[in-house]
From Swiss-Prot:
Keywords: ATP-binding, Cytoplasm, DNA damage, DNA repair, DNA-binding, Helicase, Hydrolase, Nucleotide-binding. Couples transcription and DNA repair by recognizing RNA polymerase (RNAP) stalled at DNA lesions. Mediates ATP-dependent release of RNAP and its truncated transcript from the DNA, and recruitment of nucleotide excision repair machinery to the damaged site. This is Transcription-repair-coupling factor. Residues 633-794 form the Helicase ATP-binding domain. CDD domains: DEXHc_TRCF (cd17991). The gene is mfd. SUPFAM superfamilies: CarD-like (SSF141259), P-loop containing nucleoside triphosphate hydrolases (SSF52540), TRCF domain-like (SSF143517). ATP binds at G646, D647, V648, G649, Y650, G651, K652, T653. A motif (DEEQ box) lies at residues 747-750. One of its GO terms (molecular function) is hydrolase activity.
Amino acid sequence: MTILTTLIKEDNHFQDLNQVFGQANTLVTGLSPSAKVTMIAEKYAQSNQQLLLITNNLYQADKLETDLLQFVDVEELYKYPVQDIMTEEFSTQSPQLMSERIRTLTALAQGKKGLFIVPLNGLKKWLTPVEMWQNHQMTLRVGEDIDVDQFLNKLVNMGYKRESVVSHIGEFSLRGGIIDIFPLIGEPIRIELFDTEIDSIRDFDVETQRSKDNIEEVDITTASDYIITEEVISHLKEELKTAYENTRPKIDKSVRNDLKETYESFKLFESTYFDHQILRRLVAFMYETPSTIIDYFQKDAIIAVDEFNRIKETEESLTVESDSFISNVIESGNGFIGQSFIKYDDFETLIEGYPVTYFSLFATTMPIKLNHIIKFSCKPVQQFYGQYDIMRSEFQRYVNQNYHIVVLVETETKVERMQAMLSEMHIPSITKLHRSMSSGQAVIIEGSLSEGFELPDMGLVVITERELFKSKQKKQRKRTKAISNAEKIKSYQDLNVGDYIVHVHHGVGRYLGVETLEVGQIHRDYIKLQYKGTDQLFVPVDQMDQVQKYVASEDKTPKLNKLGGSEWKKTKAKVQQSVEDIAEELIDLYKEREMAEGYQYGEDTAEQTTFELDFPYELTPDQAKSIDEIKDDMQKSRPMDRLLCGDVGYGKTEVAVRAAFKAVMEGKQVAFLVPTTILAQQHYETLIERMQDFPVEIQLMSRFRTPKEIKQTKEGLKTGFVDIVVGTHKLLSKDIQYKDLGLLIVDEEQRFGVRHKERIKTLKHNVDVLTLTATPIPRTLHMSMLGVRDLSVIETPPENRFPVQTYVLEQNMSFIKEALERELSRDGQVFYLYNKVQSIYEKREQLQMLMPDANIAVAHGQMTERDLEETMLSFINNEYDILVTTTIIETGVDVPNANTLIIEDADRFGLSQLYQLRGRVGRSSRIGYAYFLHPANKVLTETAEDRLQAIKEFTELGSGFKIAMRDLNIRGAGNLLGKQQHGFIDTVGFDLYSQMLEEAVNEKRGIKEPESEVPEVEVDLNLDAYLPTEYIANEQAKIEIYKKLRKTETFDQIIDIKDELIDRFNDYPVEVARLLDIVEIKVHALHSGITLIKDKGKIIDIHLSVKATENIDGEVLFKATQPLGRTMKVGVQNNAMTITLTKQNQWLDSLKFLVKCIEESMRISDEA
């Protein structure tokens, strides 16, 4: 974009503006948004000061930011995103917007140069005093000394929460001399101390908890946009007490108890940890002199104001909204007199003392003394939309008038295409920049702005893809580091105290934790389980593989088994029988698939390559991998049966479109089967748009087509004239004949009925099948894992997707009104989810009274199919602003313009449902907002809290596939293998059921469990060898380490575990060292055929297997063990060698030495 700024800065009109910009109050009129951005960016480039750009709302700030990213380095561009002050202060929310706010405040507090975009809401919001914010900026360096207590206190002040293990943003932990911190910005950090000196700083992976790279220094940013110190709390207590006493007599007696509860709920008087999320709503009482963001700017900052009159309008409505909101919360006993979130001073007063440059598209009167008025003449560019003749004549006019013509396109391929097109029109053009660009020619460069513009006085025109081809601007990739490492999903197998478990031999019990018991003066760790009545079972941690978490249907509370009874054996036998029947079916499926003969496609054609280059976006790595896997399948003779699992809007359709094109290029027909008429229409339009430049005949079969058109399509399929047909279950009718069907694409297969699924099954025999799904239902997920189907997963989001901002809050009409107004003010649409059909029309009336000017429609499952489709289509076509709907929108509706979702009674929904519903918004380059409301004063069930907590955690894009696993944890396995299996899964739990099924399938396939070369080794030594609670306090971490130790088979794995222990928990004590020694002995024993090592008090007994006895080289063994002298004796028992070792000082080392010698004499024997 350098060419554009070069042309502008050399122009006299800009130079006039540049002289007064930031020097005196100036009004600049006539510039379109993109032209204005170009001027502001050039002014910023030429100055050394901070530049503040104020907009009327966040939507406008987002739009200007997208254009500014073309000119300003991403590291120097900042935004202070405040969407809706009241909602943000009263709800639990996603961390992304807060991390952007913190990044901005931190840069300002450090005096960094930057271009800062701040919406009016952000300008007026109360903030922590600047000095306090500056005092809480921390940079840690290796070699420095820190006061640990003071440092941890500061972390708490900054909004961090102490946990035993860090797994979420905003947490820290202390284990010995190791401090872990997960900041809002950047990677999780591990600081290792040597006494008070920082010995090392490393970033680490929250999933594995392992360190990655060493770092010399790190900035620790706050985890909240408020700092709350003990002094702040002390001031807050006094102010709040006064506010409470002032408010109580002035409110209705009926809500005084509610006010008392509200007052006490802040727990200011007995808590040691203060919840920033709750206290932020008391910001007006926190600080003696709170700041606003203006106080953070340097005194010589340049200020630009975008559309003053719009800002004044927004300010008026913000004041009214704020007053009304505060009145509501006071009247309902949820707030106090004096509570506020914004500074009520006029906008002009806030920026008093700074020379301000006001930008306005039209000349306007303003209540401000202006020193200069600069008028630009700026015209919009003619919209060509691909019309060749109009384009040619307009370009010719620019050439004749000696204009500088700048053409912006988004990819290198398009630059080449555009030059070829202009060459055909005989328009001179260049694509490489020279020192000076001569007028009367076009320069085509990679770049994008939201719109083109013409500046006649400058002789400059900028033309974008929007004018050329009606393309929308691709949103520039921004910093993603702040959110890239956000929530990683923990295993759905994580055990918490109180969880139900299944012991393979004893049945369903309850997990009560890990307990260290002393038996015969030896300490060991055991897993404590509760069974029916008072029965308890202590399972040694080395047998923990026999214990699994119980996972089944969400509403199923399992019955505890009795220890020692026959009930569990009978249950398992029943399940075994049913599992064997299912295994039989699966094997038949598998055999059919292996033996079936399908069409074998060739390598990609030249047309395929051209078609793929046409895709305007860059593929994500997962998309590319999935495409390769699908093509590999198509190029085999066996028919493809692949499940493509990817989150909503992750580009599954593009993958399917490429497979369809490949099939068509080899003369095959493609059927694209979808569950709804509207989805059929949307996929049809996508295919038409993608394949418009290629000779591919695409038709649609749905109720939107006339009988005559349907008849023609059927005829075309029979004759081969139609290449691709998109449709609903009509495609499965018996009367449809294909000339040569090669590929069947099925979208959301689980939404089809049994009859349709059967028909799909018959088509699968010799046709390639690709199934698309956003949330894999466990059945499909599991079948894929069993190898009956292949699985491809798209987990990476497209570049321009931003996680949906998720708020969880109490139901409140003020919040709802603000959320609706915010979305409609940016010309967007809203899904309002209300899942009670009987009162849905009353809800519509209620919303209509709230929003009299909005067009509101209703959609629910009891409407006729035709009415429902017509309503949905009208909503998609932007004829309605708000759609009040039930969960029928859960899947398959794509409304890119609907970017706000409000769900009433969100606590009643299952997790995968909430996730799917949230996937309806945030599908364009705009940020999406989801508000999950739960009734005020309602105590949520633990499961509902779990669900809402999980959905808040998974604000990262792409948690869909993993959520299916988490969903098994919360919602249960559901109908995993059809209804008849449901009860069996509930009886034994999902994991044991799956294990039994897999074993049955393998047995019937003739696949034997890989038998170990040597039998299981039993090592029983009278030693304190365990993980003490003082070393690892967190039980889940403890279980995780025990599991790793149990699975250890090589010395490299032992070294890895030692490194992990030191990395995560610091140097280990003697009990842990012995535990590692025992594991090392076990590994030697595994490789040498030892079956038992038993401590018998004064001696250690060692038994070898018969096979090992035959293979051992006795001579080598005796020579190697000479240092042990008479402490070692050898004998034979049942044709197997036994060795006894007399215990003396350092006997554990002697045992390690002996076992190692046995292994070596075995290896030498093998080599001989």
